[in-house]
Amino acid sequence: MLFWGTPSYAVPTLDALNDSGYEIVGVVSQPDRRRGRGNQQMASPVKQRAMDQGLRLFTPERIRDEGDIQAELKSLKADISVVVAFGQLLPSTVLNQPPLGCWNGHASLLPRWRGAGPIQWSLLSGDSVTGVGIMAMEEGLDTGPVLVQERVAIGLLENANQLSNRLSSITAKLFLESMPRIAAAGPGIESERWKQLEVIKQEEIEGDPTYARMLSKKDHILDWNQSAMDLHRRVMGLYPNAFSSWNNKRLKVQATEPLDEELKSKLSEEVRPLLGRWQDGEHEPGKILACESDLGLVVSTKTCPLLIRQGQLEGKSKALGEVLIQQLQATVGQGLGVGFNI
């Protein structure tokens, strides 16, 4: 098989297939990119794992335009391509190569959240459930028929990194479960294979297609005139990079809890005593209402207060509770989100 993937999300599937004895004749990943604090050229997590495992590696800048690499991949005569968060659309010349097809592990319940950021958009939109699907690939963006899906509930306090870790494990599991089915169906006429595999066309699945567009820097700004729940979803969905300002410095807000009585059962137990101490909407949004040494900063919003439990001030390390308060030298009545320009 050929394995296509780039971020850490794809590594568990590569490991699972390799450890289960499948012959991986090649791994295709994105080229090295500048990343991290030092902004240095770094290999993708999948490339690094492939090198560690001694697997043959390809890193096309744009596979659609690189006929030489396409020809080399074809010469490997892979039976199947497994794709997990590769990051480029595959052209028909690649999709049509393996006799058992190209199969993609997608981190949403298709047709909801087609595109590159389904995990972030599930959280930003307040979805209560999401999941993973294995689908046959077409030239369209995540439009192919679905072989299997698994649903999972999203926790109120679950951030994008935590949800990604859960879904990546499920992706690996579903591929291991699906490979024997795909192999048993064998090559042949597509319509007959789909019937044998009992794939479901996306237009037959309940719900209209939605698209997870690319996120911009402006999407990461916290607007304290929004509701506490909208702010919380932004913090969770864009973890760890949603930000506000503090004395003209960037303050990343990385863990929050909305102090809403209706959410009491879903909040951390130690946070629940804070409920009801401030009247909703009576304070200027963005103002600090309290500095709770063991918990963090209580900040006013358009609706109920929002507790900031973890943050990272520009030039500092991540901090929780009392340490965060000390780093900010925060006092009641000060405001966030004032006088800062991205």
From Swiss-Prot:
Native source organism of the sequence: Prochlorococcus marinus (strain MIT 9313)
Protein name per the record: Methionyl-tRNA formyltransferase
Signal peptide: none
Domain of life, per lineage: Bacteria
Catalysed reactions, as listed in the record: L-methionyl-tRNA(fMet) + (6R)-10-formyltetrahydrofolate = N-formyl-L-methionyl-tRNA(fMet) + (6S)-5,6,7,8-tetrahydrofolate + H(+)
A GO cellular component annotation in the UniProt record: cytosol
UniProt cross-references to HAMAP family, sorted A to Z: Formyl_trans
Purpose of the protein: Attaches a formyl group to the free amino group of methionyl-tRNA(fMet). The formyl group appears to play a dual role in the initiator identity of N-formylmethionyl-tRNA by promoting its recognition by IF2 and preventing the misappropriation of this tRNA by the elongation apparatus.
Keyword Protein biosynthesis attached: yes
GO terms assigned for molecular function: methionyl-tRNA formyltransferase activity
Assigned EC number: 2.1.2.9
Gene behind the chain: fmt
Keyword Protein biosynthesis applies: yes
